[in-house]
Structure formats: structure tokens, C-alpha cells
Amino acid sequence: MSIINIVLEGISENHSSQSIVPVLELLRNDKTILSNISKLQLQQLVSRSLQLVRSSDSYSKWCGINLIHQLSSNYVIVAQSGVQFMSALIAVLESYNSTINVLILRNCIECLQVLMHEIRGKPALTREILTPKLSTIITLVMGHIQFDAETCLNLLYDVILHHPNTFRPFANKLRSKLLVFLKGGFGVEFVEMPTSLRKIICQTMAILPIIEKNEPEAKWGNDVKNVISEVTGILNVFDEFFNFRDDSSLGKLISKLPGRGERAELGEGDRERVFDDLSIDFNEPRSLLAISDQVETLLQLLKHYLVGGGITSVRLPLGLCLTLLEVVFSINARFLSYKSDVRDDEIRQLISTVLNRVHTSGIELLSSLLQFRGALVPHLNQIWTMLEYLVPMIQNKRIDAAEVVKNEAVFAKLVECVGLYLNLVGAVSDGASLVPFVDVALTLVEPRKDSAGNMQQSAADGQQKNQNKNKNQKNKIKKKNASSAPMSDILSHEHLFQQTIPTQTLLAVQYFFSQVITKVELPSNQHYKTLRFIIRQCVEHKNSNLEQAVPKQLRDLLVNTVLYPGYDKNNALPIVSSILIDDPIISVFNNPRLPALPKYHSMSTSMDNKDVTEVGLEQTTYQRNRNGDDDHDDDDDDDDDDDEEVSASKGSGKKLSAKELAIQNLMREQAERQKLDREKEANARIEKDAEHEATPSFAFQMEKRPREEIVEEVGKVEKKIKVGEHGLVKDTVLKSTVETVVDNKNDVANVSKNDQAQDAVGADEDNEGSDFEIPEINMELDTDEEEEGEEAE
């Protein structure tokens, strides 16, 4: 039985609830089933799927929708049955109500989205199937948006992006529904919605200007200014709590931002506003939290306007956005004092909580602007300055550690944001502006003993009081202190009461330090503290290295610590090497790899080897071979060298490493140089002995020969030497050559002339193709020997 028959049998009328799931798995995992299906089997499969979709049973309907989902991946099936599939799915949307399981609606919309994706881009299918049904689909999906907002908005977002003209009549209705979501009109506040739902709401809101027929870029720019002006209006509410006059620059910054009056001049009015006017009542703390909720919602919406990617040909107001963020960070209790009517500590604490949420939203917006990279580099100093406003300080410009730990989530995002902006540059010349952030990061990862320390301190105070009391009341009967037993655990096992640093905070600090040590030269104090934190991380992960892998963030930090040690007396290589055993960069420091030495082909060595083999040949044979084809000699030398290398590699019995080959080549070259030096010394010694031991007639006959023959004779002497084991010279041919000259004493002139002619011809041939160099001629020595020969005559 074939697989398609199993599929058809599984979706038959008498199918069970367990049989349809394996069929769906087969169709999803094996795409060749639908490619090899026959026409009759395809008709049966399509008809059975449509019957399941039209069924009144919820499970059967769900099975039919998912079957169409799998069949939509085949173009042939979509071309033949796409109209039927579209009609069946639209019928499911029309019949849906709140009493039906929401999974039916979700699967139906997802199946429609897949079917539209397969049809989109194909002109014939789009014209015949999608275009006639598109308006109906938009209407039905917008009508069910309150049941499953995320799924419906995903489909509507695709329709707006690919079919803006068709969606234009529905733009205002969709905008109204989105504003209801932003205001929390469906019973759930926007800030309490899932992250994915908030994202798709803001993305859909930001892409609506694309449907404008005329100047969509201008519409997008007006929307961005409206959002910024609304945020500015909400921030002005803090003027009721703080004295803005304490910071003279704050008023100037607010004046640069568009306000409600400018928005009214543009003709927008209150129609484009997202939120209504705020009503603050100190007796209702929830009204104060509405400030941070609205600011967070508007900043998220502004983020998707800037980086959403709906309209690409627009001019981004980066300067205006940075000014808005500077205003957000400047509203801070560190620089502004509370007004006299805000005296309640609880109200001040609530206002501080609202400010922390507002600052967190501003940091998230600033981090999202990293998409523009190079355009932000000229503003780096301004960005670091405005972020420094958030660092809490106490007297003597010290970090308020308690405030940092209390608002850990805010400062963890702050440190991570600074690290992300450091990644935009290769180096920072002035590291003084980053020192406060380094102190904040070090405070976040310091061992925390808040609860245990307080309990320990109170226990110590209690013991001190008891001791003082016992001294004053010596006569009273001693009673057992019931609270001493629990306090003893704190005193003896203090490490068990330490708080654990959250993983998210630890990852943010590790990334920040990884960027800082590579691009900033820190002061010695901060550098030593940073290195201490890194070593502490090494110690913590050293014992667990065998049980779990080192996280990537920590691995990068340790490698950068080795590459950028900072001060010479600090070296973390030993402990880092014990943790990152398999890291290729660390292994280079532990085992340096020297490059392989280059191999040089020594011409003198190859010629010496060739001459040694020709010692027993006659003088005429040697002269003929010497004046032969040099190219042939070079080829023979190369072959000999190759044979020696092959034999050496075979004799070794194993493959040598690059380091061993380099050492072997170096030793071979040293041996060759020593051999050449010994040969030169032997030749010089032979020439000297020949000059002193020769008879006058012998010297006369030798010096009578022409200068060219003497040069040739010197060349023969240099090339006819054999060196023994201990550097002694043996088996020279000087004797035989000299004896030949003495026996032919009468024919010296003729031989000299003939040899001179042959040498001239040989010299011409050598100049054409020979690689041998003519030895140097000692002109002064030849002249002296000629004069001595003439006197002897």
C-alpha cells in the first residue's frame, strides 16, 4: 500500500481522532507525496478536505483546515483548487462566533495567510483567486480582531504591506481599533499585554501612512511629530512635582520639542492624539502610574515608527529624538528638587518609581536607534552625557550602591546600552566619561549581603545588649535566649545568606566589560577592580567547566582579557587557559606556532654532487659535459633532489610535522654551508702547496700557458676535490693534469692556442645558457708568476 493510500484512508469518513495527526505529519515532512499523486487521488484528497472543513464538528473542522494548510504548499493543487479552498475558509470566518473554540479562528486565519502567500506574486492566480476575495477577508478579519488580536493583526499587516490600495478604505476603521488597544479599551492595559502583541500593534500603527495616496512620507513625518509632542506634554506633568527652574537647560530643551500648540497649527488637533488628558490625584496612586504607562506606550510606538521599516524613503529626525531622550533623562531627583507641597515620603517614593519606568522606556528607545549606526557616532558624547544623568551619586562623587542595587533592572539596561554604543567605534580616546558606568557595573556584580548583613548586624547588636545587660544584672538567674539559635546560623554560615546575581544582569555586565577593556584605557583603580571581577568569574566557572560549557559572553570576555591585558604586571592567561582549554586563540599564547622556514635550492651543492660522480671521467668528457645543455643539467639536478626527498620521506616511516620539517631543513642547510666552507679551505690549501712544491720547470710550463687556460685550470682544481670524513683532501686530479703538461713540453704553444680557442667557444656557449659562474682571476698573482717564468728562461 502506497503512502497516498494511507493518507486517503486516514481521512476517510470513518476516521478516528488519532488517525488524522499522523496523516498531517506525513504531508508536512514528505513533500514528494503531493508531487507524485495521481489526478484521481488528488480529487479524492481535495474533496475529503473540503468535507471536513464544512463539518459542524469542531475537531473535524480543525482537521480540514490543517489539511488545506498542508495542501497549499503545492502550486499545482493551489492552481486547481485554490478557489474552493479560499471559499471554504471564508465560510469558516463568516460562521465564527464567541461560542466556537478560538483555535478554529486562529488556524483558519493562519491557513488563509499561507494560502495568500502562495498566491501572491503570481499574476494569474492573484487575478483569479485573491483579488476578488481580498475585501471580504479584510472585513471578516477586522470583525474578529477582539477574539485573537495578534493573529488577525499579523494578516492585516501583510495585506497593508503588499496591497495598500485595496486596504485604503479600511484604514480609518483599523486605526480606531488600534487606538482602543493602545488605551487599554479591551479590558487589558497595553503595558500588561504580551510583548508579541504590543509589537504587532505598534508595527501596524506605524505602517498605516503607507496607504496614503499622496505624500505618504509627509504623513509619516507628521505622525512622528505628533507622538513626540504628546510625550512632551506628558513630561510637563512632572513640573507639578519638581522645580524645573533648578535646571536652566531643561527649559531650553523642552522648548526645542514640538508642543500641542504646534500640532494645532498643523491642523491635526486632538484627533491624532493617542491618549486623553491626564487627571492626577495623590489620593489615587494609580493615577500617578498612568504617567509612566502612557510614556512607555508612546515611546514604544515611536520606536516602531523609526525602525519599523514600513516607509524607507523618509528623513529620520534623529536630532529631535535625542533631544526628547535628553529631556526624559534630565527629569531626575538628582538635579531637581521636589516642590514644597510634595512632602509625603510615600508619594515621593511613588514618583521615583514612575521616573524609573520612564527612564527604562527611554533606554529601550535609545538602544533601538543602534540600527542607524554611523549616523549616531557624532552624537556619542551627547549620548554618554545624558546617560550619566541616571547614575546616582552621593557625597565625594561616589556611586550610591544601595540605589543601584534597588533599581537593578534599570541600571543593567543602562550598562548594556553603553556597551552597545561602544561597539560602534574602534577606540575611545577619553575614557573619563565612561568611568561612572564602570563603577555602576562593578556595583551590580559585587557580592550582596543586604539581608544577611542586616540580620548579622542586628544579631551582633542583640548580643552586645545582652552582654551589657548581664554585666549590670549579675545576680539575676540566666535564661536561655530563644533568638540566639537562628542568629547563630547567620554568624557561622554567612555565605549561605548571600543573594545571587541575576543571570540577565551578569550577561549585561560581562558584555559591557568585554567592550570596555578592548576600547578604553581605564584608570588603574577601575582596571584592577574589573580584573578582580574577571578572575572571580574564572574561579566560579573553573570547577564547573567539566560539567557545562562556558557561556559565549564569558568566553568572549576572557579572551579579550588575555588580548588586552592593560598593565604589564597583571596577567590572567594561566587561569583563563585552565578554563578555555579548547579555545584556538588561547592555544596560540600557550603553544606559539612559528611559520615554516622557506626552502632554498642551493645551486653550488647540486653542482658539487654532480662533479663528485664525474671524478673518474676523462678530461675531454668533462669538458664536453661542462659545455653541454644547461637546461638538461638543471632538470637532472631537480630530479636528483626530488629523489632524495622522496627517499628521505620514505625512510622516516612517518609524516613529519611542519615544525620538524623546518628544523630538518635548517640543519640540512647548515651542513651544506659547512661542507662548502671545508671545500674552500681545502682548495686554498692545495693551491698553496702546489705553488711551493712545484719545480722551476713545472712552474715555467704552467705559467707559460695563457691566462684563459690558467683560469680553466683553477676551475678544474676547485671542482675535482673529494673531501674525506675528517676534512682531508684525497684523490685530486691535479697530478694527472700536470703530468700531461710536462710530457708535452714541446707542444705547449700549440696546446695553449688550441685550448684558448676552445675556451673562447665554450665561454660563448656558457654565456648563452650556462649557470656556472666564472671564478675570480687574481691578476697580480698571474703577473708575478709570468715574470718569474721569463727570468727562468
Curated annotation (Swiss-Prot):
Compositional bias annotation for Basic and acidic residues = 672-694
In which residue ranges is the amino acid composition biased (Basic residues)? 471-481
Q: Which cellular compartments is it found in?
A: Nucleus
Query: Superkingdom, according to UniProt?
Result: Eukaryota
Q: Which SUPFAM superfamilies is this protein grouped with? A: ARM repeat
Annotated segments matching region Disordered: 452-484, 621-659, 672-704, 749-793
From start to end residue, where is composition biased (Acidic residues)?
A: 630-646, 762-793
Q: Which InterPro entries match?
A: ARM-type_fold (IPR016024), RIX1_N (IPR012583)
The record's keywords, sorted A to Z, are:
Nucleus, Ribosome biogenesis, rRNA processing
Q: GO terms for CC? A: nucleus
Its Gene Ontology biological processes? Answer: rRNA processing
Family membership, please give it. Belongs to the RIX1/PELP1 family.
Quaternary assembly: Component of the RIX1 complex, composed of IPI1, RIX1/IPI2 and IPI3 in a 1:2:2 stoichiometry. The complex interacts (via RIX1) with MDN1 (via its hexameric AAA ATPase ring) and the pre-60S ribosome particles.
The UniProt function text for this chain reads: Component of the RIX1 complex required for processing of ITS2 sequences from 35S pre-rRNA and the nucleoplasmic transit of the pre-60S ribosomal subunits. Regulates pre-60S association of the critical remodeling factor MDN1.
- Protein name (database record): Pre-rRNA-processing protein RIX1
Source species of the chain = Lodderomyces elongisporus (strain ATCC 11503 / CBS 2605 / JCM 1781 / NBRC 1676 / NRRL YB-4239) (Yeast)
Gene encoding the protein: RIX1
